[in-house]
Structures are given as C-alpha cells and as structure tokens.
Amino acid sequence: MTLSLDSLRSAAQVYQPAVIDFTRRLVSTPSLPGLENEVAAIISNEMNKLGYDEVWTDQVGNVIGKIKGGNGPSIMLNGHMDHVDTGPVEGWPYPPFSGQIVDGELWGRASLDMKGPVACMIYAAALFKQIGLKPPGDILMTAVVMEEVSGLGTQHIASQFNAQAAICGEPSNNILRRGHRGKVELVVTFEGRSAHASVPHLGVNPHYAAAAFLSALPTLDLPQDEVLGASTVTPTLYTTDQSSSNVIPSKVSLILDWRNVPAESPEMIIAKVKTLLGRSLASRSQTQGCRATVTITDQEFTTYTGVSQLLPSIFPSFLLPETDRFIQQAHTALVNVLGRDDGVDIWRFATDGGHLMKAGIPTIGFGPGDDKLAHTNQERIPLAQMEEAVICYAALVLALAEAAK
C-alpha cells in the first residue's frame, strides 16, 4: 500500500499542470443543466487521451469512463458537469468563465462546484494506468448531468451500475464527509371561491387559509439529529391564479423547502403538513369553505440527449456512522496521504450522494474547495487543494476497495 501511494503521489505531481489546464477548459465552457453537451465532449476526449479502458456516453448524457481492475470491488467516482447560473456578471471580481488564476486560486463559475473536483477525479483514476498499477476492481468515473436541478444523471447511473462503494466529489475543503440533510420540496395549495374584491362576502378568500397555515408553521415539532442538526422548513415562493388586483383569487399556492434528517421520510413530512393544515384551517372562521392540499412538487426535465423524465423534488438525506468501515478506512487513508488529521464532517447542503446511498451504494464525500463559496460570485478553488485531491482520490479508491471486501 505504501509503495502504491508513493508511486501514485509522484505521478500526481507530474499531472498537476494538466489538471489545471483541463479545469480551465471546463470552466470556460458554460454547461447549465440540460446544456452539458460541450463539456461532456471535452471530458470524453480527456478520458480517451488518458488511456481509460472504456469511455462512453449513456442515453441521458452522462459520461462514463472505466479503468479495468481485478476481480475485487468496483468503486465509483461521481461528479456533475452542470452548474448554476452566474447571476449578474458585473458582480464577479473576474469573468465567471475565464478560469483566471489569481494568488494560487482558479476563479469562475463551477470551478469548485464542481468542475475542479471532476478534473481531479478523472486524473486520479488515470494515475493507475500511468504507473501500471491495476486497481483491486474496476474504477467507474461518472460525470453526470443535471445535478443542480434534479439529480437525474446520478439517479440513472445508480439504476445501471452496482458499484460496491462510491466517492461523491463535491467540495469539502479536502475533509472527509459522511452525510447531509436531504431536501423535499412541497407545494401547498389553498382553493377558495373567486369574487370581485368589492363584494368579498360572495367569495372564499384563500389568502386567509394560507395565512393561518403560515402562522402555525413555526409550531411544527421537527426532529433533531445529534450530528446533522434539526430538520427545517422554509416557505419560499407564493403564487395566485389571478393577475388582477381587484379580484379575490380562487387558488393560491406556496412552496415549502424542507430539509430533512434521515429519520424523517417524505411520507412522514406529507403527513405532518396535512395534520397542520387540518388544525390551522379549523381554528379560524375566515378559512371556512377553503380546501387545502399538499403534494411533493415534480418537474419534467429534458437532457441534452433529448431524454425527458418527470421527477419528484427529492434529494435523500444520509448519514454514515463514524464507526462505519468505509469511513474508518477512508479516514485512515487521508491521514496517511495528507500527514494530518482533519477529522470527519458533514455537508450543509444536499448532494447526489443521497441518491447513491438510496440505491444501496455506500458513499463517502470528499473534494477540493470551500463549499461555502459554491453558488456565489466569489467561487474559486485553491490549486494546492486540487493537487492534494488527485492523490487523495486515488488513495480513497484503494481504501474503499479494502473496506468493501
């Protein structure tokens, strides 16, 4: 193992200029969800250039590269090709698609979320070919579509491959991550009876029912996890079926962003909201005659390959125990490679790791870059962390293969 790591470390240092160049090319190529085709082509070409044994693009547009190993456990490296919008370009210190390097950091949209980590993973898998070391089992590098809007790409991957373990490469400041809260998006709809605003007694105003529900929402008893913290629910968007200001709407809807801990399933969330609706609407005379419903939102997404899927707005939560053998092996490997013990942490946001765990694939998290900068106009990734990450990803492949035996 030590000999393997020394060889991998030496090869990773040689690769560093190429990793940076590759990341800059990825960052300079915009790839919003559903428009990842150009970046997918760049990634596919890079994998072929690096000598991957197999490279292909699946029906939804994910790019998969395989490094063939022995008969041991297969390990998946997972990262997404899409990114969020830049927002106002004038708010960026440097052009968001320039990939400009300033003071040892590479700037730009998706530099850390997550084209930099994807580049590091692609080169980490290639290290085994570079030094002629056959991994214990196959390495599957999966660069996926549409993580930012649905997780469609990884859900498809999880249904196609039976890897024995996975690394979700989202940024983590090169600290091992073992889980996160999930996300469930709900729409609560209140239906009344429309009328002219000058004769409100002829209608049933759904605004009052929505107000009663929102007033009661903070009283919900939300579960607490000693590691992940409490579940949270946040009202975000509010819409009506009217555009005229002198008409009582017949229907209003509000969106709830629910961040759930593993002990709280989507079905439990729906039941809680229904109970609260019944209680809050029964308490006020102004809400009589109003009907309320709650559902998990869904949306149809179309990939750049033309495949359309209707998916619910659910990102599963997960949490591996610190005593889990995958966490233990990964932590030991990182301490050995980095020469320091940064401990084990969690993410504060949802990732595709939840979809992998739901599919039964044990998943750890690790990636270069400060995740607090994701989705901001300060997004950038330290080159030093990228150099560390290449060797760390390779070491984690070996560690997870050992844990999966």
Regions found by a protein language model. Name each.
Residues I64, N78, L140-T142, E185-T189, ...:
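Beta-strand secondary-structure signal
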Residues G116-T219, D225, N377-I391:
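Fold-level recognition of mixed alpha/beta catalytic cores in primary-metabolism enzymes, strongest
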Residues T2-G87, K251-I255, I269:
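N-terminal helical capping/dimerization or prosegment-like subdomains
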Residues T86-I101, R178-T189, T332-A333:
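Acidic-glycine-rich active-site phosphate/pyrophosphate-binding loop
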Residues T2-L3, T189-K405:
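Metal-dependent amide/peptide-bond hydrolase catalytic core
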